[in-house]
Regions:
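Generic preference for hydrophobic/aromatic residues in regular secondary structure cores
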Residues: 5, 18, 68-69
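Amphipathic, hydrophobic secondary-structure cores in small proteins
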Residues: 13-59
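Short, charged, surface-exposed hinge/linker loops at domain edges
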Residues: 51-75
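Basic, low-complexity segments
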Residues: 1-15
Length: 75
């Protein structure tokens, strides 16, 4: 599923996008967080598929799963 996500410095300044489009993963996540439904996204972006939306969510989850969190030391 992650193969649907593309990172190319020549496309959207290297931000992760849905492969073959200029639709950033961030846009999909932001719209969903603002209350947009999958149907809303599919209507607004005809080139987008349900699998693309799922790939964006999976990509975001993977990025968070591998994030390194540095906690401030207690003084």
């Amino acid at each position: 599923m992650i193969e649907r996500i593309e990172i190319d410095p020549a496309v959207m300044l290297g931000k992760p996008v849905i492969r073959g489009t200029r639709i950033p993963v961030e846009l999909i996540l932001r719209k969903l967080s603002e209350g947009a439904t999958e149907a809303d996204l599919l209507d607004a972006y005809p080139r987008l598929t349900r699998a693309d939306i799922q790939a964006a969510l999976a990509y975001a989850a993977d990025m968070l799963a591998h994030e390194i969190i540095v906690l401030p030391s207690a003084a």
